[in-house]
Structures are given as structure tokens and as C-alpha cells.
């Protein structure tokens, strides 16, 4: 079983890349972020020939998340309690039966935070506080939960191209990292880092000339699995090929494979 997360950065612009990716990788579940379209303008018709169910929480021009799944959802949730950004489409959860058991699958697009000290940065921290509180309710029920998304936080020095240059800049501050570690310490694992403890790879590069070619990136896209999913994990890796295609997203997919 294969679960993928990908910040597609406009599904309209990247529709052909999406179709090719689905055909090549054949994921069981694909979590998308930054689809940048309203729910009713999601390309349902253009993808209707594919063997998937489509769950969408869209927003005009900005944000937007979706879950594309071979398995039908029993329940769909489009927000969590006290979400600071409840007016923005940044969260989508489905509950469904999978080969590894009944699961909660979450597609998350965390806010960037603008610059350190700004109102948006403070709001980002509040978003994380409330998301952490929401996850704690799942832990109390011992539910299987997998979160995929653009977290807009690089966890450790190994996850950025230059810790010195990026020190205490947005997405790489100690206070942001503490929020992410609170999630990890509450019973979740960063599946890529679990499989590759010392490997340096990135999931995002600025579009500015040379950033991808010079590998000046950050690893801010992740799949987190709660502890009761780890025994099923086979591998977790990234697909660099999509960043070399024409009109790519600035993010690449993160792929986790599980035993059936």
C-alpha cells in the first residue's frame, strides 16, 4: 500500500503532471496541498476515468487540500476545533478502512508564517497549538493516524541546505521546531527520517534560478505516522523526477509504502 503527499502548487497548472504521476506511481492514497481552486472547480471530470475517490476542501486562488483515494471514506472532516485559520482550506481528514486497519488520514497545509515576529508568524504558532490539541484527542482513543502535508517547518539542521544562513528564519526557528517535535513526541514518527536517519534530501526549492540545480532546499513536506502504523512501514522516499519536468511544483512528492 502506498500513501503519497504532494504540495502540487495549483492543480490546474499541474494537471498533466498529476495524471502522469498517478499512472506511474499508482498510489493508493494521494494527499494534495495548495490545489488553489474552489471545491466545485476541482478537475473531477478530467480525472473521472481513474480508479479513485476524490475528497476536496478548496478555496479560490489560495491554499486548498484534497485526498485522492482508492478506498472510500466513511467520514470526511474539513476542520478541527479552534483552528486559527478556519476560514482557509488547510485541513482535510478522512476516516476509512485500509489494509493496515481503520485509519484517520489527514492532508495538512500549514501556514508559512511570513517573517519571524509578524502577526502571521504568531498565527502560525497558534495554528499548530490547536492542531496539536486536536491530535491529542486521537491518541486517547489509540486510533491509527497518518498525516501528510506541507508542514512549513524543517525539523533539524540536516533538513536545510545551510543551517547557518537560515538560522532563525521562517520555517527554521527553534520555536517552530518545538511545535513539530511536540507532535513527534506525542506518539508520531517522521517516516522519512525513520527510514533515513542520516540522509540529507529536500522536498522544496525556491523557483529562483539555480536553487534546485544547486540543491538549496529544505525538507518541509513530510508523512507522519502514529506509532501503531510503524510495524507496517516498508519505505519512505521522495520523487525528485517531478521537479525536473516542465512547469513543476516547487515541492516534490513524499512517498510511504506499507505492508498490506
Q: Model regions: which residues?
A:
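Active-site-proximal beta-strand elements of phosphoester/diester hydrolases
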Residues: 1-10, 102-117, 148, 251
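N-terminal, active-site-proximal structural segment of metallo-dependent hydrolase catalytic domains
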Residues: 1-52, 62-65, 155
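Catalytic metal-binding/acid-base residues of hydrolase active sites
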Residues: 9, 36, 109-111, 152-154, ...
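Structured beta-strand-rich core segments of catalytic domains in phosphoester-bond hydrolases
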Residues: 35-115
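Metal-dependent phosphoesterases centered on the DNase I-like endonuclease/exonuclease/phosphatase
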Residues: 50, 127-220
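Conserved beta strand-loop-helix elements of the APE1-like EEP
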Residues: 61-76, 199, 210-232, 258-259
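Surface-exposed cleft-lining segments at the edges of enzyme active sites
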Residues: 81-82, 110-128, 164-169
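Surface polyanion/phosphate-binding segment centered on an Asp-His-Pro turn
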Residues: 237-260
